[in-house]
């Protein structure tokens, strides 16, 4: 199987083409294993589609399916344009709906669409939380110090609410810093696109930031977010790492 390794603001992905849908959960888990496989946060399968430029299957590191992945969508768009030679302005089908993307060399902007849902704030485990769905559910906690991030606490919240968990610090009205515990990886990752989107949207909704901001995830790779016409836009660099063949024994 020919595969391509991609990175986007700290998240890494294994991407391949396929001609039909099937359950690839076991394969995803094998490929994403950092000790015995290729190593990645997620596995993306690009499939043909009659109406859109392509359709994808997205698998988390543990083999579970996910409807959406922000950084994964940017990596998929970069792959579709540079490897599959699809037009740089494209749309593709995910489990969370249609994603529109624009590729400009190594920069990719995607529209994450309209926010699916937002719930009221609540108190739990000594912190204030809000739940926001940007294609997948995210718990968000605004803090003064990102050292508050606690993996054990995140595990408890993730298990109870079946959601990703984010800690966010507002540096100023144009800049946020975010740390994310991702379900499916079951640990903190270097970045999470939909998580950063949830943090930005809630900060904007609460009038704490402008409608266009920079966000720095744990990886340090700064990305841009904007909210316009009731849609969430996400832009940043994508890196093609390498391509190779994976042999099954």
UniProtKB/Swiss-Prot annotation:
Catalytic reaction list: (2S,6S)-2,6-diaminopimelate = meso-2,6-diaminopimelate
Keyword DNA-binding: no
Catalytic residues as annotated in Swiss-Prot or TrEMBL: 69 (proton donor), 192 (proton acceptor)
Alphabetized UniProt keyword annotations: Amino-acid biosynthesis, Cytoplasm, Isomerase, Lysine biosynthesis
Pathway noted in the entry: Amino-acid biosynthesis; L-lysine biosynthesis via DAP pathway; DL-2,6-diaminopimelate from LL-2,6-diaminopimelate: step 1/1
GO cellular component: a single term: cytosol
GO MF term set: diaminopimelate epimerase activity
Protein location: Cytoplasm
Coiled-coil region(s): none
EC number: 5.1.1.7
Primary localization: cytoplasm
Enzyme class name: isomerase
Family that this chain belongs to: Belongs to the diaminopimelate epimerase family.
Assembly information from the UniProt record: Homodimer.
Function: Catalyzes the stereoinversion of LL-2,6-diaminopimelate (L,L-DAP) to meso-diaminopimelate (meso-DAP), a precursor of L-lysine and an essential component of the bacterial peptidoglycan.
Family matches, as NCBIfam families: DapF
Name of the protein described by the UniProt record: Diaminopimelate epimerase
């Amino acid at each position: 199987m020919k595969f391509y390794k991609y990175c986007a603001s700290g998240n890494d992905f294994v991407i391949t083409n396929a001609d039909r849908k099937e359950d690839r959960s076991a394969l995803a888990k094998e490929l994403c294993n950092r000790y015995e496989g290729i190593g990645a946060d997620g596995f993306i399968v690009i499939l043909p589609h009659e109406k859109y430029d392509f359709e994808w299957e997205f698998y988390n590191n543990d083999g579970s399916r996910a409807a959406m992945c922000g950084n994964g969508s940017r990596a998929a768009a970069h792959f579709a344009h540079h490897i599959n030679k699809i037009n740089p302005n494209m749309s593709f089908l995910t489990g969370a709906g249609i994603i529109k993307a624009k590729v400009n060399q190594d920069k990719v902007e995607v529209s994450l669409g309209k926010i699916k849902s937002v719930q009221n704030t609540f108190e739990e485990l000594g912190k204030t939380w809000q739940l926001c769905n940007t294609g997948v559910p995210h718990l968000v906690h605004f803090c003064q110090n990102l050292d508050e991030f606690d993996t054990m606490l995140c595990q408890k919240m993730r298990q109870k609410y079946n959601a990703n968990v984010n800690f966010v610090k507002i540096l100023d009205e144009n800049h946020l810093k975010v740390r994310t515990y991702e379900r499916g990886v079951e640990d903190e990752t270097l970045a999470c696109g939909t998580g950063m989107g949830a943090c930005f949207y809630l900060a904007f909704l609460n009038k704490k930031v402008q409608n266009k901001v920079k966000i720095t995830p744990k990886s340090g790779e700064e990305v841009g977010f904007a909210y316009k016409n009731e849609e969430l836009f996400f832009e940043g660099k994508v890196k093609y790492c390498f391509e190779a063949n994976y042999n099954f024994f």
